[in-house]
Amino acid sequence: DKRVAESLHLGPADRVIRIERIRLHDDEPILYCIDYVPRSIIPSRPYDLDWSGSLLNLLEEYGNRPRMSAASVSAVLLPEDVVERHGLKDFGPALRITEICFNAAGAPVNYAIDYHRGSHFSFSLTRK
């Protein structure tokens, strides 16, 4: 995907790890997440890792904890293929946050697309 490669500064031969998760609250889906991480920053075999916990902690374990990010927010509906594949027809409107996270050296370490269920989240923003 060109957008992922550009966001993570990947070359044509570089590999990426894609993590797709649904986060629940009281057994109800409230967050649909897609994260992309450059394969080069995770030296372990992907199948040997526990992906169910915090991605930030995992990145920190390998010396790449995000220190800052650039994000955009928009009101959307979940993509239809996601709704059908995961049975999320009742998810409703969402706030999509698209974000690039950078480590302390300024290198991109995560490209994330998160869909926050509109009925369960509110955000406060400070703008300059």
Report residues per predicted region.
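C-terminal all-alpha effector/ligand-binding and dimerization domain
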Residues: 1-128
